[in-house]
Swiss-Prot record:
It is found in: Host nucleus; Host nucleus, Host nucleolus. Residues 1-33 are annotated as: Disordered. Interacts with host KAT5, PSME3 and EP400. Residues 1-13 have a biased composition (Pro residues). This is Protein UL27. The gene is UL27. It comes from the Viruses. Promotes a cell cycle arrest in G0/G1 by inducing the proteasomal degradation of host histone acetyltransferase KAT5/Tip60. Residues 18-33 have a biased composition (Basic and acidic residues). InterPro entries: UL27-like_protein_herpesevirus. Transmembrane segments: none annotated. Keywords: Host nucleus. GO terms for cellular component: host cell nucleolus.
Amino acid sequence: MNPVDQPPPPLPTQQPEEQAKEDHDDGDERLFRDPLTTYEYLDDCRDDEEFCHQFLRAYLTPIRNRQEAVRAGLLCRTPEDLAAAGGQKKKTPAPKHPKHAMVYIRRSCLVHSACATAHGKYDIRGLTLESDLAVWAALRGVPLPPDPQHFRWLNAGAFRRLVHEAQYLPEISRAAKRIALAVATGQYVVCTLLDYKTFGTRTHYLRQLCSMTEELYLRLDGTLCLFLEPEERELIGRCLPAALCRGLPVKYRTHRAAVFFHATFMARAEAALKDLYAAFCECGDGRDNGGNHDGNHDGNDHSSLSPSAVASHHSRLEHAELRLERNRHLGAFHLPAIRHLTAGDVARVQDSVSRDLGFADWSQTLIDDYFLLPAGWACANPRRGYAMYLASNAVLALRIIRLLRASIRHEYTACIRMLSGDVQRLIRLFKGEAALLRKGLAQNPVQRRELSRFRKHVHDLKRIRFTEDTFVETFCDFLELVQRIPDYRSVSLRIKRELLCLHVFKLRRGCRAPPTPETARVQRLLWHSLRHGDAPQDRTRLPQFSSALSDAELSNHANRCRRKAPLELGPAVVAAPGPSVRYRAHIQKFERLHVRRFRPHEVGGHAT
């Protein structure tokens, strides 16, 4: 059957969201292709660098009066034509004019475009516009609220693949591509590991978990006044940090949350929780306290268990062998033996921890008490149930803290190793270029200068040594060094800004990305940056980050930011991530009115 003759799909089966997306795409296509699309330029800020003025002169033509509007095709007849034909004009009904779009271009958006690309914000140069925005969104989107269904931690290997497989400009050399990859890796370390105070980074989440665990232990200590029996008070006292640190080289009074990273502290906390279950649990679920990961239990002895205990008897939390989805190289692990969980609760906790260590679920809760475990244990009297609940939450948080610390350490060392490899690769590239010039005997002054330059680059790169203690300082030195390499320094930021502004204001299509949830996310993030502005993460700003990932620094929350302060894009950006557009049939004012300087299919440029 001929595809042209096939009937269109029935409209009732199309979802409203898909229909809205198609309408939005068709509207964008009309804006790009319509030669009568006009643009109104709004001066809402200063133009200190003359970029906005030069952009308007290059790509827009002002319309000052009706004669210019007629020449641009916006109007049909001038006032002189109307006056000359006034006596012979017949009374005919006024024609119905089609409506054409008017796009509003704000000067502030043009100014803020400097930091709306990976080149301007992170100094990652040489990428095409589409790849540049993808890399920029991966780094700038770290503080966004996570989607509980689709969020995954981005690891260094996946991010480097994104940059390595990206499309580069045709004039970019191999050395410039390697420099861009190294700069992107260094910025990834800063954005995801060293920025302690920004929501969405692993170190910020680790600090918040340490603070939450301290609060849980403080509340558990406060329950001692509810118990009069010395045996019960002693059982709860064994679960507190002071007792768990006894005999260890770290003390809770001096090291505070740093003791949570100690393996012996974790083992003692699990043993104390096991004893607490054995003494306080009345439903029978706490009698079998784990350690048996093979799932072999007596299937006939369920008479003393509660219905929830029977349902979860064969699906213990500690039985499953889990792996982090984006860090499987860290190996398998088991969760602690937490009781009073149904089969659904066990599956939910295991899935949340293996997916993102509970980050997405934690970011959706309002109270830290309800971290991952369900509230309302009814297996004992309220006093005992509350004490078991606090101790169970603390033990589960301890396991996640240790897993998160291990992933942070691995990411940090892996990035340092990759950056050191990039530096060595650059040294080999420049040595190879110098060898080619030497074989050609450097016959003229230009070749001799090039040979001297390559030798200077090799000498400077040999002094770049990335370490854990001086990462930020070394990275700043590396950024300063690559500014002296012509292959990287000559990549123009102005051209990248022009391509971005031409695309977002519907003048010329700069990239044709398929409509996916990821591209919609990039579009919203881009317009948030264009409207509100941003600051470049360059050598002047990087020294404010600390290179130390010590236990004391990872657990330090004295000067932390608010617990949950994600980057809110605002309802206006979420609802309409694009320029303001209105449709008009008549032009009454010519103030601030512009049209494209080049029309579609004319010499000098194309709108599509």
